[in-house]
Amino acid sequence: MAKSNYITRSGWNALDQELKFLWKDERPKVTQAVSDAAALGDRSENAEYIYGKRRLREIDRRVRFLTKRLEVLQIVDYHPKQEGKVFFGAWVALENEAGEEKHYRIVGCDEFDPAKNWISIDSPVARALIGKSIDDEIKVETPSGLVILYINQIWYEK
């Protein structure tokens, strides 16, 4: 499945900050370190030079990716019409059949973070939640079988 191009404003800002940091701060420092290491002579056995060149390639790869990705991402802001229903950017309190409740936020694929309970809009759970309301039931097929979840609460960061 293709990645969606949706992102929250805070997610877009974080990627933009990362791009600026890599281009304006990190890359010049690494470039200088590579130049200094190259001036020491034999480059074939110069660990600082080899590591610096590798790091420079990593930075350049990430800069290219971020530059292209930021051009196609579509920022989705909160709108009052979303209240009461699950849409992109929503926080949702879900309860399983055992009565355990967990909170998830639906975000773009570039910003999902399991440690924060941020799930990608492209995930099966998020897809099942879109357009649903409080007290609705969703069914999600998982590797361990069908899971039924109940929506207890929906809120948005404004």
From Swiss-Prot:
One of its GO terms (biological process) is regulation of DNA-templated transcription elongation. Residues 53-75 form a coiled coil. The keyword Coiled coil applies. Keywords: Coiled coil, DNA-binding, Transcription, Transcription regulation. PROSITE patterns: GREAB_1 (PS00829), GREAB_2 (PS00830). GO terms for molecular function: DNA binding; RNA polymerase binding. InterPro entries: GreA/GreB_C_sf (IPR036953), TF_GreA/GreB_CS (IPR018151), Tscrpt_elong_fac_GreA/B (IPR028624), Tscrpt_elong_fac_GreA/B_C (IPR001437), Tscrpt_elong_fac_GreA/B_fam (IPR023459), Tscrpt_elong_fac_GreA/B_N (IPR022691), Tscrpt_elong_fac_GreA/B_N_sf (IPR036805), Tscrpt_elong_fac_GreB (IPR006358). Transmembrane segments: none annotated. Belongs to the GreA/GreB family. GreB subfamily. PANTHER family: TRANSCRIPTION ELONGATION FACTOR GREA, TRANSCRIPTION ELONGATION FACTOR GREB. Necessary for efficient RNA polymerase transcription elongation past template-encoded arresting sites. The arresting sites in DNA have the property of trapping a certain fraction of elongating RNA polymerases that pass through, resulting in locked ternary complexes. Cleavage of the nascent transcript by cleavage factors such as GreA or GreB allows the resumption of elongation from the new 3'terminus. GreB releases sequences of up to 9 nucleotides in length. This is Transcription elongation factor GreB. It comes from Pasteurella multocida (strain Pm70). The gene is greB.
